[in-house]
Amino acid sequence: MRFRSFFFSSSIFSLSHSRSPSLSSSRFSSLSAAMSPALEKSRQGNGGCNDDSKSKVTVVGSGNWGSVAAKLIASNALKLPSFHDEVRMWVFEEVLPNGEKLNDVINKTNENVKYLPGIKLGRNVVADPDLENAVKDANMLVFVTPHQFMDGICKKLDGKITGDVEAISLVKGMEVKKEGPCMISSLISKQLGINCCVLMGANIANEIAVEKFSEATVGYRGSREIADTWVQLFSTPYFMVTPVHDVEGVELCGTLKNVVAIAAGFVDGLEMGNNTKAAIMRIGLREMKALSKLLFPSVKDSTFFESCGVADVITTCLGGRNRRVAEAFAKSRGKRSFDELEAEMLQGQKLQGVSTAREVYEVLKHCGWLEMFPLFSTVHQICTGRLQPEAIVQYRENKL
């Protein structure tokens, strides 16, 4: 595994930001008043670039992982002279039980009290419920929402993104279209006409939020320069990011591992033991690699040994939300639906593994590959009630 210090960072299918110069004086004053002396000192120290030449970042999404991403980026934006201090974060407008709007509470308390309680995001994070306004003038877009919302978000932003804009997707999942599967980075690139990298890895958001050491992988195509910029923007002493020239491989790892985590949750719910769980994880990783290479022959073997690969499978199968909800599903012997369990256990967060399992199943069925991927096929059939949870080990592995 390669370690790169933050301080030295420099197929068969096609598959929110900185303060604008025109920002109202009242909003500017409000933000400035909230800033700490350290922030003011940092701004003075970044005098080498004028505001117009600095990169402006918007985080599109404000859930658990989106809030953590904003925290990471906000801390670095203050230190890096080429980035504007303010980081905008698009917040889907919702009203909290006390009647206050979530975005207002975030701006008042500097904390996402619903999805990341107890963690300060940084005084330079500004929540904005208006998607178009949040991305206005931004030239660095970070997409981090449930994958099922991405098509609608891209349609809203179509024609609104202008100039030299770069994007990165932290979204795990895919869209299944008539012509085949479409990765989220491809969806962003095609609908918005911009380059899109990806960031995936063994990243449980709450652990990164409290600054426990973690790794991640940035997948890029084309020039290494933009990948290094994203590495610089995300890296901290406790969050180590490595660039890999393999967008599809990195993104498919982040997508498919959630299906494996659902399988691991079934094993835990049925108390089948660690040996069985290890076997499921191995088979799952093997099917991840095989499917990735069938969809994109250019996917590199080495990608599966990065944080986005085997490390993410291990982390997600041990502690992720997909594993946890699947465990509860298996304990109920399928009598409680995933929708019911998601609402009860995740409190507004979205479960990715079940919808991804369905999408993967559709691809396998369309291509005639169901028998080649028995674990992926079985997970979907258990999720939909066609099979009982015990079926997770009642098949013969296909030697791909």
From Swiss-Prot:
This is Glycerol-3-phosphate dehydrogenase [NAD(+)] 1, chloroplastic. Pathway: Membrane lipid metabolism; glycerophospholipid metabolism. InterPro entries: 6-PGluconate_DH-like_C_sf (IPR008927), 6PGD_dom2 (IPR013328), G3P_DH_NAD-dep (IPR006168), G3P_DH_NAD-dep_C (IPR006109), G3P_DH_NAD-dep_euk (IPR017751), G3P_DH_NAD-dep_N (IPR011128), NAD(P)-bd_dom_sf (IPR036291). SUPFAM superfamilies: 6-phosphogluconate dehydrogenase C-terminal domain-like, NAD(P)-binding Rossmann-fold domains. It catalyses: sn-glycerol 3-phosphate + NAD(+) = dihydroxyacetone phosphate + NADH + H(+). GO terms for cellular component: chloroplast. It holds the Pfam family NAD_Gly3P_dh_C. It comes from Arabidopsis thaliana.
